[in-house]
UniProtKB/Swiss-Prot annotation:
Transmembrane segments: none
The organism of origin for this protein: Yersinia enterocolitica serotype O:8 / biotype 1B (strain NCTC 13174 / 8081)
Family annotation (SMART domains): SprT (SM00731)
Protein name per the record: Protein SprT
Cofactor mode of binding and number, as noted: Binds 1 zinc ion.
GO MF: zinc ion binding
Gene designation: sprT
Compartment(s) where it occurs, according to its Swiss-Prot or TrEMBL record: Cytoplasm
A Pfam family: SprT-like
Active-site residues, as the UniProt record annotates them: E79
Lineage of producing organism: Bacteria, Pseudomonadati, Pseudomonadota, Gammaproteobacteria, Enterobacterales
Names of the cofactor(s): Zn(2+)
Cystine bridges: none
Amino acid sequence: MSSLRIPIALQQAVMRCLRHKLQLANQHLGTDYPEPKINYHQRGTSAGSAYLQSFEIRLNPVLLLENQQPFIDEVVPHELAHLLVYRQFGRVPPHGKEWRWMMEHVLQVPASRTHQFAVTSVRSKTFNYQCKCQQHALTIRRHNKVQRGESEYRCRECGEKLQFVAKKTC
């Protein structure tokens, strides 16, 4: 898979936001946390991930390119907050009260667990499954688990086990 090139100006905007929010946190908390490593290798529909032990933030390059400033304003502080909470409080729920406090009171950003970016360009292929009451689209990962007999999925409405609907060939 070839990686997307993130323009230097966009990388610099990410780093400006990261450094500004980190400075706010260090001043507010009386700490001197180092700058986390940033990479642009996040895949799928996730906008970003925080790697706690390695103090690293992984950002989705496609969603960054498609949503530039809103992405920087929301996702960079969101992932930074995870790292700071881990350093400050240890292992706590990922979007718990400590994380919300870090987002709103320290980083001064509204605490939102999920992004609202369009994901059609990064959504993976889905497979059709059916129950008694409706059709379901399973991701390739879930489909493969069903095919290998490792998992089964049930409808939340009727409780019936989902059955794969094979595509008809002519």
